[in-house]
Amino acid sequence: MTTLAIDIGGTKLAAALIGADGQIRDRRELPTPASQTPEALRDALSALVSPLQVHAQRVAIASTGIIRDGSLLALNPHNLGGLLHFPLVKTLEQLTDLPTIAINDAQAAAWAEYQALEGDITEMVFITVSTGVGGGVVSGGKLLTGPGGLAGHIGHTLADPHGPVCGCGRTGCVEAIASGRGIAAAAQGELAGANAKTIFTHAGQGDEQAQQLIHRSARTLARLIADIKATTDCQCVVVGGSVGLAEGYLALVETYLAQEPAAFHVDLLAAHYRHDAGLLGAALLAQGEKL
């Protein structure tokens, strides 16, 4: 049975057909609409899936935000244009006339990455550092989603009580500092207004401010990982996302984590499926895996 998997992120929408063998084919992308209207997202999703839906028997959605009863609740509205209560499952069922499930994108990615691990691992945490910072937790070999879908939203834990205000309404969240949006927001002078990708480019060219911004992000993530180790005693942490997978970033995180006491050290791995983890995880869950 073929699954039409959809990944809804803060900057892009992706869709692909995934067979029972887990192979991805006919992958497509569109920019996430900047408009805050449900109509804009519906139209973009329609354009994305219409060439693919005839080849699928079901739909699986991995989306940023909290997924509750098939609808999108944006913990940080800035990451998805302020959409609230957008009926993801209902919308895709109407567009495709196919049975549909939906799950948070980082939770979906965590499940895919867990399947790729070697050895006897039952405790794993996945972190995505991209437009925002999200996560997924596997404990006892099972994916944790929580009764309200909030499990794994580790980007909204405290990093700095005097830090910037996060889009979720809290002050000093990890996401407000370590994410691509957080890196860009802290840029000043010649880098003011630059996005995270541009800042990474400048850092590679030796720009001191750009390097400091990236180190600040990596240091914040390392402290989060130490907190996660203390909370879950996980056997490994897998890091993905456009920032998390940027050249040299994970090595920086490892350097800062090594400065923490040994009890908080944990193996760090780069995401095996890279940017396709959300798509694959959603498809796996649609194949009958229990949440």
From Swiss-Prot:
GO biological process: N-acetylneuraminate catabolic process
Alphabetical keyword list: ATP-binding, Carbohydrate metabolism, Kinase, Metal-binding, Nucleotide-binding, Transferase, Zinc
UniProt pathway: Amino-sugar metabolism; N-acetylneuraminate degradation; D-fructose 6-phosphate from N-acetylneuraminate: step 2/5
EC number(s) given by UniProt: 2.7.1.60
InterPro entries found in the cross-reference section: ATPase_NBD, ManNAc_kinase_bac, ROK, ROK_cs
Catalytic activity annotation: an N-acyl-D-mannosamine + ATP = an N-acyl-D-mannosamine 6-phosphate + ADP + H(+)
Gene3D superfamilies: 3.30.420.40
One annotated GO molecular function: zinc ion binding
Protein name listed in UniProt: N-acetylmannosamine kinase
Source organism phylogeny: Bacteria, Pseudomonadati, Pseudomonadota, Gammaproteobacteria, Enterobacterales
